[in-house]
Amino acid sequence: DYFRFGGESWNQPTDGGPREPLVDKTEHEMAGYVDFRQQIVRWLTFDAGVRLDRHSHVGTEWVPQAGFSFSLPRHMVLKVSAAKGFRYPTIRELYMFRPANPDLKPERLWSYELAFSQQMQDGRLSYGVNVFYIDGGNLIMRVPVDGRPMNVNTGRIRNAGAEVQAAYRIGAAWTVDANYSYLHMEQPVLAAPEHKLYAGALFTHGRWDVSTGVQYVAGLYTEVKVAGQGEYRTENFVLWNLRASFRAAKWLSVWVRGENLLAQRYEILAGFPMPRATVMAGVNMNF
């Protein structure tokens, strides 16, 4: 695949003054990839893949991944995998506004995961447990350099955690599900929570679809220390969301959605409060 992205930005004073150019940059990204899957024996499957990414500014990046899947008795599945991930710096981070730094390098990480899942009661009940470890580096963060903010590549991160999820189909109309995740961070990461718990329900009957869920988030870092500067700030909050839709005709459905219905005050990034209770409605037409 091939991507070409970028453009020109400027400030135009409202008093009719001269236009102030900000950035005029175009980047190119080209990649090729191959995926491979082989069933070695009836109960064992091997997956592998590799992607070669070429960025016009940053250079070339190899992105491999591999894993094994074990099909066990009683509809149990065990998976083990390792994969590399990366993120190129954006044009904004490289060139735009005061924190820009054209010398940024890509963020890189390796993730290792062990996952177990099972289906029971003819598929009505399913559950899974995952444990993972992440080893990364070159995270892009904004830090003070010579008295002014600048985007820089910071040090390594080592995170480990676990996830548990379950779903149960009560009947033809009702399904409930829940999940919990725990994240241990050797070095706290911005916008990452230590604990996240969710419980939800789905009702489907005739022309109606209604879903709702409550999510509890604890220890979400809205601000972190970088190079010994700044402070650690965390948020705890509960969110309740609801969505309902009614199919009025084959080609027409009406929907309403409510988010943060408990009107919680919270932030994901320090200094940027999230909306309180929000309600939206609309129609979908299919021809």
What are these regions (language model features)?
Residues 1-58, 71, 125-131, 177:
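Face-selective signature of the C-terminal outer-membrane beta-barrel domain
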Residues 2, 9-15, 30, 50-56, ...:
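Transmembrane beta-strands of outer-membrane beta-barrel pores
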Residues 3-7, 46-48, 64, 78-80, ...:
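Transmembrane beta-strands of outer-membrane beta-barrel proteins
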Residues 26-30, 60-62, 108-112, 156-160, ...:
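Residues that define the transmembrane beta-barrel architecture of outer-membrane proteins
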Residues 37-38, 52, 60, 70-71, ...:
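Residue-level signature of outer-membrane beta-barrel architecture
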Residues 39-45, 131-135, 152-223, 253-254, ...:
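Gram-negative outer-membrane beta-barrel transporters
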Residues 77, 81-137, 143-169, 189-195, ...:
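Outer-membrane beta-barrel signature, preferentially recognizing the C-terminal barrel domain
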Residues 135-137, 216-225, 242-287:
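C-terminal beta-signal and adjacent terminal beta-strands/loops
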